[in-house]
Amino acid sequence: MTEATQTARTLSGKVVSNKMDKSIVVLVERQVKHPLYGKYMKRSTKIHAHDESNQCNIGDTVTIQETRPVSKTKSWALVEVTERAAKV
């Protein structure tokens, strides 16, 4: 028997919340073509992700990867912080 190897999905987005311990909420935007008019529209999804070391801040651009479920709502984990938000 040969097993098919699956590669975990990765997405990138912006952190919109880090108030939970070891958790972040990432806003992932994508473009979808309207079925009738053909115009491209922005659609967004909020994904809860696991941040083991609490290293993310609001506004950071991050890369997340799909993993096994960590809790009821978290099945994604932080891979890296791509870009830090500007400190005000």
From Swiss-Prot:
PROSITE patterns: RIBOSOMAL_S17
Keyword rRNA-binding tagged: yes
Keyword presence, Ribonucleoprotein: yes
Any one Gene Ontology molecular-function term assigned to this protein's record: structural constituent of ribosome
UniProt-listed CDD domains: Ribosomal_uS17
Pfam families tied to this protein: Ribosomal_S17
InterPro entries documented for this protein: NA-bd_OB-fold (IPR012340), Ribosomal_uS17 (IPR000266), Ribosomal_uS17_bact/chlr (IPR019984), Ribosomal_uS17_CS (IPR019979)
GO BP annotation list: translation
Family indicated by similarity: Belongs to the universal ribosomal protein uS17 family.
Subunit structure: Part of the 30S ribosomal subunit.
HAMAP family per the UniProt record, alphabetical: Ribosomal_uS17_B
Name of the protein: Small ribosomal subunit protein uS17
Provenance organism: Marinobacter nauticus (strain ATCC 700491 / DSM 11845 / VT8) (Marinobacter aquaeolei)
Lineage: Bacteria, Pseudomonadati, Pseudomonadota, Gammaproteobacteria, Pseudomonadales
